[in-house]
Amino acid sequence: MARALRAEASARRGVLDPETGKLSRPAEPLGELAQRFDYVLVEADGSKRLPLKAHAAWEPVIPSGTANIVWIVGASGLGKPINEAVHRPELFCERCGCELTVIATPERVAQVLNAEMQALELSTARVMLNQVDTLSDPTMADRFEAALGRPVIATSLQG
């Protein structure tokens, strides 16, 4: 598999938009890419470089035909004030009934994530807690998983 990933024909990247500086999907329809490659990874949306996000009503945009969803949560936002760690903090606070200046606890983040996943009917989505190496309190990952009520992949992806 590692050799296949290094092969030029087995990986694609999006097209850089010179006006926005953002990557967009390639010209080929995703269905065609899915027929040509074993895996097609799509970032559904961004979070303005913040570790946590409350999604707007139209997000995330999930392409039709998606087989698996991995919802990534930035652990570096746990234990920080919501107004510093969350993209769209007002929506986040609306969903968990708290103030902007309170701490983004594992329980609050799980409450918001559960509400969003339920609204999108994503009961089979997997959840990855990334950046666990940044946690000052390692029990936060366990608390997040317990509050979420489903298994969580806790990791620190580098690079």
Name each region found by the language model:
Residues 12-15, 40-44, 153-155:
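General beta-strand structural signal in soluble alpha/beta enzymes
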Residues 1-5, 39, 46:
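Short intrinsically disordered, low-complexity coil segments enriched in acidic
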Residues 1-20:
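N-terminal phosphate/diphosphate-binding loop that engages ATP/GTP or pyrophosphate donors
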Residues 20-36, 45-151:
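Conserved catalytic-core segment of NTP-binding enzymes
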Residues 131, 158-159:
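Long, charged alpha-helical interface segments
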